[in-house]
């Protein structure tokens, strides 16, 4: 999607439906969420549903959606969409994405091995309006995550090498 130059076509909107995370791998060592929350004395390891949870379906007084049609929605950038703590909210999040086919949702995960158990029943080979990005910060994580990611039923995929801790090859060893 973005790698094909389509990212410039979209207006962008942030949707942090839950906040907080648990450091999962070496790439989490200097997490910006932990760093930012630390400035305000907030515990980033506590995952909470945010007041913005229902944003994609919220409407203005005139009846128009608050997020206009055609936006690229950066989803869950202060957590991991597949984090276990959000299992109880995820079905509702998928439903909002299903309803808002006029938006394109994009999230990044380090927990790609949880995808199959977190997908909605009507997912099939993926929603047309969802891009799932997978972080692979070093060769160890490429070797582990890439085979899972390749086999996952996702229509739009982006590999994220951030933070890029060591040289990585796109081929598992």
Please state what every model-predicted region is.
Residues 53-169:
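Conserved AdoMet/S-adenosylmethionine-binding subsite of the radical SAM
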Residues 1-10, 167-173:
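Single conserved hydrophobic/aromatic residue that forms the stacking wall/gate
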Residues 12-47:
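Canonical Radical SAM [4Fe-4S] cluster-binding loop centered on the CxxxCxxC motif
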Residues 6, 25, 69-70:
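A structure-centric signal for secondary-structure junctions around beta-strands
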């Amino acid at each position: 999607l973005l790698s094909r130059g389509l990212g410039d076509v979209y207006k962008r909107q942030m949707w942090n439906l839950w906040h907080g995370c648990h450091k999962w791998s070496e790439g989490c060592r200097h997490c910006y969420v932990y760093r930012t929350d630390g400035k305000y004395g907030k515990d980033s390891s506590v995952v909470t549903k945010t007041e913005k949870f229902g944003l994609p379906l919220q409407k203005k007084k005139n009846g128009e959606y608050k997020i206009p049609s055609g936006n690229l929605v950066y989803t869950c950038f202060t957590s991991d969409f597949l984090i276990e703590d959000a299992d109880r909210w995820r079905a509702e999040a998928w439903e909002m994405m299903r309803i808002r086919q006029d938006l394109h949702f994009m999230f990044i995960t380090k927990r790609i091995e949880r995808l199959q158990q977190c997908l909605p029943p009507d997912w099939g080979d993926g929603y047309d309006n969802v891009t799932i990005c997978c972080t692979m910060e070093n060769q160890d994580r490429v070797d582990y995550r890439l085979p899972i990611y390749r086999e996952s039923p996702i229509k739009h995929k982006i590999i994220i090498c951030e933070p890029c801790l060591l040289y990585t090859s796109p081929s598992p060893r």
